[in-house]
C-alpha cells in the first residue's frame, strides 16, 4: 500500500519506523526544518527518513497548489500524520482513496488542539493517551481508529510523560498499522459533548500565580520543566526559574508569594505552600533550593511575584468607526473585558453599545464618517490601532444603491487609509469574503485564489470590487509607504445583534435576520433561487476571538497578512439554514407568542434583489492562515449559533410587545382618570 507521511518529533520517528516495519510503500516524507531557536530534545524525522533512504521534503506551505499537485501525482493509497504541525487541506486528503489518519497525543475527544502533554499536567490529570483518528476538516475531530491509555503519576514531568507517550504510540501503531494495511478498520465517532480544546503554550505561560494552590503551581512546574523554558517568578527585577518542586500541606497566615523558609526554600501559596527543590536565577546555575536562596539573597519574609513594571503601561487605544454595528459592538465587549484596551468609537447610533457607555475605558461620539472627518483624523493620530468598520454590506443595497455603496465603502474609507499612512498608524481593515466572487477553487485561499467577478451590468459586484480595490491600495501602501496593516475577511458571521428586524422589513438585512422576521410576522420564508446557495456560517464569538488576536498581534505576526475568518465545517445552504431555524423556532419557549408558520416560497433572485444581481453557489474559506498565524480554530456549531440568534430576536420582540401593551394600558388608565376627574368637577359645580 502506497503511503505519504507527514511527521515531526519523536512520535514522527516512531510512526515512520512502524510504517516501514508494517510493509507500507512510503512514497514521500514531509517534515519541518529544525528551528535554531527551538530547544530540540527529540529525534529528527529527516535523519530517520534519510537513513531509510526515503525521499524527504520540508516545504514552508505544504498546502500550496504546487505541492498539492506533486502529492496528487504520487497517487497515495493512504496518508498518515504523526505530530506534523500543520493541518492538511482537503485536496491533499482526498488524493488518498483510503483517507488520511493522524496520531494525536491525548485520549480524544479530550484535549484537542496544541500541547496536550503540557496541558494534561497543568490541569492535574491522572491519565491521558494517544489516539489514531481519521482526519476531517475540523482539527482532531475525526472518527477514532484506536487508542492507548497512559497513566500519569504525581512525579511525571513533560519529559517523562513524553517518553511514556512515545512508547504508547509505538505499541498502538504496531497493533493497528498491519490491520489497516489489510482491511479497513471500524471507526468510532467522537462524542462532541465530551470534547475539549486547548491552544498553544508559550514561555510566558510559565509565569507563576502564587494565589493558586500549591498543587496547581506544582502541576505547572511539572508541565514546563526541562526541556521547556520552566515555571518562573520574580524577586524584584530578577527572574527565578523553578525546575523541580513539591506541594506541602501546611497552614499559614502569610500573603501568597511570601518566603516561609530558606532551608528548605518554601513559598506560601493561596492554599498550602511550595517547596522549591531545584531552580536557578536567569543568569545562574542549576542548584538546590537552599543554595538558590543564598545566591539570590532570598530571606524569610520576602515576597516573590510578578516583575515590577518599569513604568505603568498605557492601554492600547483602539479606534472603531462603526462601533455600534454587529462586529463593532461585539469587538468592543471583547476588548473592554481584556482590560488592556481603551476604545474610542464613532457611529450614527448607540442602541447596541449603550451597555458600555458607563465604562471609563470606552469613549463614544455619535456622528457620521462622511461629516466628522476632522474628529476622525484627530483620533487616528491619537490611537494605536484603527478599525474602519463602516460599510454597506447587505446584498440588496448593491443593486438598489450602487453609487452610495461605492461612496461609503470605498471613497470614505480611502480617506481613513490615507490618514493611517499620514500618521503611521496600524490599520486592521475589514475586507470581505465577497472579494473572491465566483472563484472556482474548492477553498478560497488568501494568497492564491483568483478574485473573479461578473460583467459590469451586474451591479451587485460593486461592493466586492470596492473592497478589493481598497485591499490592493492598502497592500500597495504597505509595500511603498511601510503602512502597518492586516486585512481580515469574515465569512458569514452570525449571532445576536446582527442587523435588526426594522432593517429586515425593508429588505436591508442579512439572510438569518430576514428569515427570523418571516417567522415573527407569520409570512412565508422566501428562498431566493430555491435557497440552494451554500455558505459557511461563523459564530460571532469565534469570529471576534480571531479578530481580537489580530488586534493583539503577538510578535507582529499579523503585520502585512490577509486572514480569512470563517468556519468551513459549518457549511449549509440557505434552505438548510431556514429549516434549522424553523426547528429551533418551533421548540422555543416563546413560540406561542407568534403566528403559525406560513411555509416556504421559492422566488427568483431578480424578483427579490432586482436587476443586476448575480449569486455565488458556494463560498468556503481556507483558514490555514488563521490557524498558523493566530493559533485559532472555530469551535461553535451552527445550530448553537442559530438558537442564540433566534433567542435574542424573539426576546426582543416579546419585550417590545410587552412595553407597548403596558403603554397602552397606562394610556387607557390615564384617559379614564381624566374622564372621572371631569365628571367629578361637573358634579361639584352642579352642587
Swiss-Prot record:
Any GO molecular function: UDP-glucuronate dehydrogenase activity
InterPro entries tied to this protein: Arna-like_SDR_e, Bifun_polymyxin_resist_ArnA, Epimerase_deHydtase, Formyl_trans_C, Formyl_transf_N, Formyl_transf_N_sf, Formyl_transferase-like_C_sf, Lipid_A_modif_metabolic_enz
Cited Gene3D superfamilies: 3.40.50.12230, NAD(P)-binding Rossmann-like Domain
Site (Transition state stabilizer): 102
Pathway note: Nucleotide-sugar biosynthesis; UDP-4-deoxy-4-formamido-beta-L-arabinose biosynthesis; UDP-4-deoxy-4-formamido-beta-L-arabinose from UDP-alpha-D-glucuronate: step 1/3; Nucleotide-sugar biosynthesis; UDP-4-deoxy-4-formamido-beta-L-arabinose biosynthesis; UDP-4-deoxy-4-formamido-beta-L-arabinose from UDP-alpha-D-glucuronate: step 3/3; Bacterial outer membrane biogenesis; lipopolysaccharide biosynthesis
Region described as Formyltransferase ArnAFT: 1-304
Any Gene Ontology CC annotation: membrane
Superkingdom, natural source: Bacteria
Active site annotation, chain numbering: 104, 434, 619
Residues that bind UDP-alpha-D-glucuronate: 393, 398, 432-433, 460, 492, 526-535, 613
Annotated catalysed reactions: UDP-alpha-D-glucuronate + NAD(+) = UDP-beta-L-threo-pentopyranos-4-ulose + CO2 + NADH; UDP-4-amino-4-deoxy-beta-L-arabinose + (6R)-10-formyltetrahydrofolate = UDP-4-deoxy-4-formamido-beta-L-arabinose + (6S)-5,6,7,8-tetrahydrofolate + H(+)
Residues carrying the site annotation Raises pKa of active site His: 140
EC number: 2.1.2.13, 1.1.1.305
Positions that bind (6R)-10-formyltetrahydrofolate: 114, 136-140
Sequence segments annotated as region (Dehydrogenase ArnADH): 314-687
Family: In the N-terminal section; belongs to the Fmt family. UDP-L-Ara4N formyltransferase subfamily.
HAMAP family, A to Z: ArnA
Record text on subunit structure and interactions: Homohexamer, formed by a dimer of trimers.
Protein name per its UniProtKB record: Bifunctional polymyxin resistance protein ArnA
Amino acid at each position: 500500500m502506497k503511503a505519504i507521511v507527514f511527521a515531526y518529533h519523536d512520535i514522527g520517528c516512531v510512526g515512520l519506523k512502524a510504517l516501514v516495519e508494517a510493509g507500507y510503500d512510503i512514497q514521500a516524507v514531509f517534515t519541518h526544518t529544525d528551528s535554531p531557536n527551538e530547544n530540540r530534545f527529540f529525534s529528527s524525522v529527516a535523519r530517520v527518513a534519510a537513513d531509510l533512504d526515503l525521499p524527504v521534503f520540508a516545504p514552508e506551505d505544504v498546502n500550496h497548489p504546487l505541492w498539492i499537485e506533486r502529492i496528487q501525482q504520487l497517487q497515495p493509497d493512504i496518508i498518515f500524520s504523526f505530530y506534523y504541525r500543520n493541518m492538511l487541506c482537503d485536496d491533499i486528503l482526498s488524493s488518498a482513496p483510503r483517507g488520511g489518519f493522524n496520531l494525536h497525543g491525548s485520549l480524544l475527544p479530550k484535549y484537542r488542539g496544541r500541547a496536550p502533554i503540557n496541558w494534561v499536567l497543568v490541569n492535574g490529570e491522572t491519565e491521558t493517551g494517544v489516539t489514531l483518528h481519521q482526519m476531517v476538516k475540523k482539527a482532531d475531530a475525526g472518527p477514532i481508529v484506536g487508542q492507548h491509555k497512559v497513566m500519569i503519576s504525581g512525579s511525571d514531568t513533560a519529559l517523562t510523560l513524553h517518553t511514556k507517550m512515545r512508547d504508547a504510540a509505538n505499541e498502538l501503531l504496531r497493533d493497528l498499522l498491519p490491520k489497516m494495511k489489510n482491511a479497513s478498520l471500524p471507526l468510532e465517532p467522537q462524542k462532541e459533548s465530551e470534547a475539549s480544546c486547548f491552544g498553544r503554550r508559550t514561555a510566558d505561560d510559565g509565569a507563576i500565580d502564587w494565589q493558586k494552590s500549591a498543587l496547581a503551581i506544582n502541576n505547572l512546574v511539572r508541565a514546563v520543566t526541562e526541556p521547556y523554558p520552566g515555571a518562573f517568578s520574580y524577586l524584584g527585577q530578577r527572574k527565578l526559574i523553578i525546575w523541580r518542586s513539591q506541594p506541602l500541606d501546611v497552614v499559614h497566615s502569610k500573603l501568597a508569594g511570601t518566603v516561609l523558609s530558606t532551608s528548605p526554600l518554601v513559598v506560601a501559596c493561596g492554599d498550602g505552600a511550595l517547596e522549591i527543590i531545584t531552580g536557578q536565577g536567569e543568569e545562574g546555575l542549576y542548584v538546590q533550593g537552599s543554595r538558590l536562596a543564598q545566591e539570590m539573597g532570598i530571606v524569610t519574609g520576602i515576597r516573590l511575584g510578578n516583575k515590577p513594571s518599569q513604568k505603568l503601561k498605557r492601554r492600547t487605544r483602539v479606534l472603531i468607526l462603526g462601533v455600534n454595528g454587529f462586529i463593532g459592538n461585539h469587538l468592543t465587549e471583547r476588548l473592554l473585558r481584556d482590560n488592556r484596551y481603551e476604545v474610542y468609537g464613532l457611529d450614527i447610533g448607540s442602541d447596541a453599545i449603550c451597555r458600555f457607555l458607563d465604562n471609563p475605558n470606552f469613549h463614544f461620539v455619535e456622528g457620521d464618517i462622511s461629516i466628522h472627518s476632522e474628529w476622525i483624523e484627530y483620533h487616528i493620530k491619537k490611537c494605536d490601532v484603527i478599525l474602519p468598520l463602516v460599510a454597506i454590506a447587505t446584498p440588496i443595497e448593491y443593486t438598489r444603491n450602487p453609487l452610495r455603496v461605492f461612496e461609503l465603502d470605498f471613497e470614505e474609507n480611502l480617506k481613513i487609509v490615507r490618514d493611517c499612512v499620514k500618521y503611521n498608524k496600524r490599520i486592521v481593515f475589514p475586507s470581505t469574503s465577497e472579494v473572491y466572487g465566483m472563484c472556482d477553487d474548492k477553498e478560497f485561499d488568501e494568497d492564491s485564489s483568483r478574485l473573479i467577478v461578473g460583467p459590469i451590468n451586474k451591479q451587485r459586484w460593486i461592493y466586492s470590487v470596492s473592497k478589493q480595490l481598497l485591499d490592493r491600495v492598502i497592500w500597495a501602501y504597505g509595500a511603498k509607504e511601510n503602512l502597518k496593516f492586516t486585512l481580515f475577511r469574515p465569512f458569514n458571521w452570525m449571532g445576536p445583534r446582527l442587523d435588526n428586524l426594522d432593517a429586515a422589513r425593508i429588505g436591508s438585512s442579512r439572510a438569518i435576520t430576514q428569515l427570523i422576521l418571516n417567522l415573527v410576522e407569520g409570512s412565508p420564508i422566501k428562498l431566493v433561487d430555491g435557497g440552494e446557495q451554500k455558505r459557511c456560517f461563523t459564530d460571532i464569538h469565534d469570529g471576534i476571538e480571531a479578530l481580537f488576536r489580530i488586534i493583539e498581534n503577538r510578535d507582529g505576526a499579523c503585520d502585512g497578512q490577509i486572514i480569512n475568518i470563517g468556519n468551513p465545517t459549518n457549511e449549509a445552504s440557505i434552505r438548510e439554514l431556514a429549516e434549522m431555524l424553523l426547528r429551533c423556532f418551533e421548540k422555543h419557549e416563546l413560540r406561542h407568542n407568534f403566528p403559525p408558520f406560513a411555509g416556504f416560497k421559492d422566488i427568483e433572485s431578480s424578483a427579490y434583489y432586482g436587476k443586476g444581481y448575480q449569486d455565488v453557489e458556494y463560498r468556503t474559506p481556507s483558514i490555514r492562515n488563521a490557524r498558523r498565524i493566530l493559533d485559532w480554530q472555530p469551535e461553535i456549531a451552527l445550530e448553537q449559533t442559530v438558537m442564540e440568534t433566534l433567542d435574542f430576536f424573539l426576546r426582543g420582540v416579546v419585550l417590545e410587545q410587552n412595553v407597548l401593551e403596558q403603554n397602552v394600558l397606562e394610556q387607557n388608565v390615564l384617559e379614564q382618570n381624566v374622564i372621572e376627574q371631569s365628571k367629578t368637577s361637573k358634579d361639584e359645580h352642579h352642587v
